[in-house]
Amino acid sequence: VIYTVVAGASSGILCAVNANGSEKWQYVLPGDTPYGGAVIGADGTVFANGGKAVVAVTADGSLKWQFDLDEPVQNCVPLVDNRGYVHFITDKATYYVLTDEGKLYGKKSLGTKSFASPVMGPDGMVYIAAQEEAKSFVFGLGTGASGYADSAWPMKGQNPQRTHLQR
């Protein structure tokens, strides 16, 4: 199964497509996501962003949880760690970590804007870029995780090197 996000005029759509090209299911996201994408947790949960929210959708297309925000998260693909926690950064550069149940674990302002997606090394360290007053910064943040999720696609580009090679 391939999971993809399709941008729309007012909302994005998270789609599951079978190997033969037929649609398995689709889930309408709570807002547009022109540069977002989907990632997969170790248990098969699919995570995506849309508008001012991040959602967790089960492998059969049912909503597991939705985390609503006060600011847009349209330019980031989430990341899921080995605990099932979801990491992302908003367009206004607020870095969030949610538990596997969709509850806030932590957040931190890293600047004024971001067009990046977090990447996690095999040691659980998260790297993320943000901007502040025309200056760009890359942050390395300890997360308490011991690595990214053992799944087919835990982050943008599939792995820390962004090779897009599915295992």
Model-derived features: positions:
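Extracytoplasmic/lumenal domain signature
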Residues: 1-167
